[in-house]
Structure formats: C-alpha cells, structure tokens
Amino acid sequence: MNTKILALGLLSLALGASGCRNTGKQATQLQSVGIAVPRAARITIDKLPEILRNVQAGRTQFDFTGICGNGTDCIYFMQENGKFYIDFEAMSKEQLPYLDSLKQFAKEHNYPVVETTYNNTPVDYEHLKYAPVISLKVHADIDSIVKVGKQIEQTIFRNNERTVYEIVP
C-alpha cells in the first residue's frame, strides 16, 4: 500500500508540475539535445479493457493505472480484491471544481465515496496542505469500470471516443 501511495504521489507531482498535456513538446525539446525521453503509452478509451486486464493479471509495475488526456482529466483505476474503483486527485487548482462534480456523479449512480489524500502537496494552491482525493468505490469488474470511466470522461471532462489518453504510470 505504501508503494502505491508513493507511486501515485510521484506520478501526481510529475503530472502536476509538467502537466499531462499530450503535446509531446517537452519530450521533443529534450530529444533535440540528445536526451532520451520515454513516452507514455497512448490509447483511446476502447483500449482500456486490455490495459486493465494486464493490471489485474499482475503484468504491470503497479496494481493500478490511470488515464490522462489533458492534465486535468486524470483518473486512476485502483484495484482491491480483484475489483476496480476510481480515484481522482486534485493536484492543481483547475482540478478542484471536479471534486464536487465527481461527488455528484457518484451520488447519482449510488457509488460510495471516500474523501482522502495521498499526502501530496498541491502544485499551484496553498489553502490545503495536501491534495484531496475522491475515491469512487465502484468495486466493479473490468467491463463495468470501463463504462464508469468512460461516463466520467465524457460527462464530467467532456472528452469523447477519439480522445487520446496517456497511460499513467
């Protein structure tokens, strides 16, 4: 569990500081001076079940994964006892309004919500010591959690079937 928190913390810090803006500009700049930069895998939402099957089978470095299309819409697919739930961490101030949107979404769909933190320091606001996390305790199989993730990305973040997401971590 501590490894999961540390990994999510480092990931959130990296995404919050640099943004998961899907432009590739930073990587291109570093590559132009001879620094090799690994690129995150990119998918559309229809490929998410395959990624989650790999997570569930233990074929990934961590027992969770996330998708991030524009730096604000990052959701994490967490695993517990073979079932998945979704976390959202508000690392930047532009993510804060989505906490209430996700709570409302969870209420409308009768998903239990847990408010927590990974003890990560927000990147551009100081009124909270740690970045808040909303955990939607869906406890679903892969097909069901993909539907929930797709609903969140489309209704809350206004993404669509063609949105390209980076897989994180």
Question: Residue locations for each model-derived region?
Answer:
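Structured alpha/beta or helical-core interaction and ligand-binding surfaces enriched in interleaved
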Residues: 24-169
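Bacterial N-terminal signal peptides
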Residues: 9-16
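Bacterial N-terminal signal peptides that target proteins for export
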Residues: 1-7
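N-terminal Sec signal peptide cleavage junction
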Residues: 18-20
